[in-house]
Amino acid sequence: RLFKAYSQSASTLNLLRAFSHGGFADLKKVHTWNLGYIKKSPQAKKFKDLEDKIADALAFMDACGINSEFNRRLKTVNFWTSHEALHLPFEESMTRIDSTTGEYHATSAHFVWIGDRTRQLDGGHVEYCRGIENPIGIKCGPTSKPDEIVKICNLINPKNEKGKITLISRFGHDSVEKYLPKLIRGVKKEGVNVIWSCDPMHGNTIQSTTGYKTRRFNNVLKEVKDVFAVHQSEGTYAGGLHIEMTGQNVTECTGGAKNI
């Protein structure tokens, strides 16, 4: 399974490179991007209006001589990959030494994270991540304690470099206000440099009557809104969202634009 996953990942990355630098990412093509999921949605008109505004802005820029023909930044985009550094033997096999600096780098992804269940201070996942130069994410759920998270940050990032550590909160839609403020205050008190991110997916998993795991879209959205509200009140910034995606149109979440 690992060999198959590796092969599929390599193929996906090759496709991303082709799309991101072959002209498909050109903003002029915004009308041709995958719109199948939105066409029959009540939100279709809003999406179309946004497309039209982007097209109008690009037309104005073109009239000013700013276009993708002379500015590659308008037709290309950089992709950075990320995954959980869960399977340590696999991660070890993908770790390389920079011959110019002697530093270790994980080449399985640009950014790797430690899961909420594997962030033990004396665990192998923290030990591995503290030995590589990649930016590192740390999942923080309801069981996380501020002092514990600070210790992990200091262990992985002893120089307190900005941008090295991202704390990814995953408390669930009904627990953000209970846990996140304490975590933010604990980290700020110790002067630890972190980027704050929100994972509204993994804390909101429920089991349907058929036995399948699913999520309610409204719960996902509520966690995102609560996280932004807490950061605003604490004087910090939500620096990103951790969202699960799929290459196919599947119905995993209930609710949403079509109120499934």
Where on the chain are the PLM-derived regions?
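Active-site-facing alpha/beta catalytic cores
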Residues: 1-172, 212-215, 222-224, 237-260
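Extended C-terminal subregions enriched in glycine
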Residues: 169-248
